[in-house]
Amino acid sequence: MLKSINHICFSVRNLNDSIHFYRDILLGKLLLTGKKTAYFKLAGLWIALNEEKDIPRNEIHFSYTHIAFTIDDSEFKYWHQRLKDNNVNILEGRVRDIRDRQSIYFTDPDGHKLELHTGTLENRLNYYKEAKPHMTFYK
């Protein structure tokens, strides 16, 4: 039986740039560094970075695949400004219904898509039940 997410590992082209991003911008706690690796605790998750300089990274820009972190509504403006102040690549978000809450989509230095979201799974399901009758819901 699966218990939980164990860790998330990102391949990065420059370990120092990525350490700066995850520690100094996203405020992750740096746990260890090695020649080609760094571990963080971020939002209760173990985030691993492995430096791999010679792999293609072009396809990542065409995918909606991302990791979303929860933030409070009251912190939305703070985080948006923090990302802007640190010249983070903020992506154009999709048009949202207010019931779907707020999100900021952005990328790390290697183009991995991340999201800061103010909603919960329950918010999303309730919104979809109200607004999307074509969807099938299971218990």
Swiss-Prot record:
Superkingdom per UniProt: Bacteria
Alphabetical GO biological process terms: response to antibiotic
Active-site residues, record numbering mapped to chain: E115
Swiss-Prot/TrEMBL cofactor(s): Mg(2+)
Annotated Mg(2+) binding sites: H7, H66, E115
Keyword Repeat found: no
Broad EC category: transferase
Keyword list, A-Z: Antibiotic resistance, Cytoplasm, Magnesium, Metal-binding, Transferase
Protein's UniProt keywords contain Glycoprotein: no
Function (record text): Metallothiol transferase which confers resistance to fosfomycin by catalyzing the addition of a thiol cofactor to fosfomycin. L-cysteine is probably the physiological thiol donor.
Entry's family note: Belongs to the fosfomycin resistance protein family. FosB subfamily.
Assembly behavior: Homodimer.
Protein name: Metallothiol transferase FosB
Species in which this protein is naturally found: Staphylococcus aureus (strain MRSA252)
